[in-house]
């Protein structure tokens, strides 16, 4: 069948291509000018390896906490008519738009040595800054909204009639959550968890304020940029980009293996013409 020229689609294609260039050109430029052997040697240095381990460890801990706490919150916001529900949803979105450095200052004011929580725990010799806990707290603040918002949208997309039918058969809310709501919403939730882990891994601003030491990989990259300039910071930047790409690839692969590829590749199966 002959395709007709559609100026609207051409215009949209040009506009979209400009955005893709802005998104992909920096990554392509990084790969084209890569010094593989030198970067590998730089990343094999003890300080770089320590920063990488800390970032992966902290972001994984943060991801587990975000999943454990964020998924139930998303379910509540999707299914329960809470008082001031719109306000709670807006508050969940807030850390996504607050500048990272401002978020770090807020965290330090609360959890720092002279903060409301930090001062209280300090009497028991419990410190929440300049350690792994401080890094995790920073990552939770900036990345947890991705899990909550994704869970909220995923649970809201589940047909409530399925839960109502299960309720008429005597299923409890707890049983309906595990047998109906969570399995159907999981593809969207998993996508949010992946994005949250990537966001936590690359968190810089709040971590810089809350836990400059021990260096996470983004903070280490900044230290190298200050001491050695752009050339010195490129290996860490490359490592972060590759980790993010690997996380996205693994997420897509798992979606395909579990039969959820349609969620991220198309709107849904198309009906065949009769």
Predicted regions and their residues:
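Membrane-water interface segments at the C-terminal ends of transmembrane alpha-helices
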Residues: 3-37, 46-156, 180, 184-200, ...
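Short coil/turn motifs that cap or connect alpha-helices
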Residues: 83, 172-173
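Membrane-helix/interface signature in polytopic inner-membrane proteins
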Residues: 152-164, 173
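Hydrophobic positions on the alpha-helical face of helix-turn-helix-like DNA-binding modules
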Residues: 165-166, 176, 180, 221
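Glycine/proline-centered hinge or cleavage motifs at structural transition points of membrane proteins
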Residues: 169-170, 183
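Short hydrophobic, aromatic-rich alpha-helical segments embedded in or entering the lipid bilayer
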Residues: 212-226
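Short, Lys/Arg-enriched, Gly/Pro-containing loop segments at transmembrane-helix junctions
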Residues: 258-268
């Amino acid at each position: 069948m002959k395709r007709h020229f559609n100026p609207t689609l051409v215009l949209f294609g040009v506009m979209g291509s400009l955005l893709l260039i802005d998104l992909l050109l920096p990554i392509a430029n990084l790969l084209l000018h890569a010094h593989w052997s030198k970067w590998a040697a730089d990343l094999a240095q003890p300080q770089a390896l320590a920063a990488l381990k800390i970032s992966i460890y902290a972001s994984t801990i943060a991801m587990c906490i975000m999943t454990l706490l964020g998924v139930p919150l998303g379910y509540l916001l999707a299914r329960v008519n809470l008082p001031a529900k719109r306000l709670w949803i807006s508050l969940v979105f807030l850390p996504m738009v607050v500048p990272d450095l401002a978020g770090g200052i807020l965290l330090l004011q609360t959890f720092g040595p002279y903060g409301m929580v930090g001062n209280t725990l300090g009497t028991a010799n419990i410190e929440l800054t300049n350690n792994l806990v401080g890094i995790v707290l920073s990552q939770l603040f900036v990345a947890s909204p991705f899990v909550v918002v994704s869970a909220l949208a995923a649970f809201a997309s589940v047909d409530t009639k399925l839960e109502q039918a299960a309720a008429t058969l005597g299923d409890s809310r707890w049983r309906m959550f595990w047998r109906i709501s969570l399995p159907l919403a999981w593809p969207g939730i998993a996508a949010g968890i992946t994005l949250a882990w990537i966001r936590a891994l690359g968190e810089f601003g709040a971590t810089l304020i809350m836990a400059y030491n021990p260096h996470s990989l983004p903070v280490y990259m900044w230290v190298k940029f200050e001491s050695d300039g752009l050339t010195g910071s490129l290996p860490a930047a490359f490592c972060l980009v590759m980790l993010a790409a690997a996380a996205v690839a693994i997420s897509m692969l798992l979606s395909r293996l579990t039969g959820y590829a349609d969620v991220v590749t198309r709107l849904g199966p198309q009906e065949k013409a009769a």
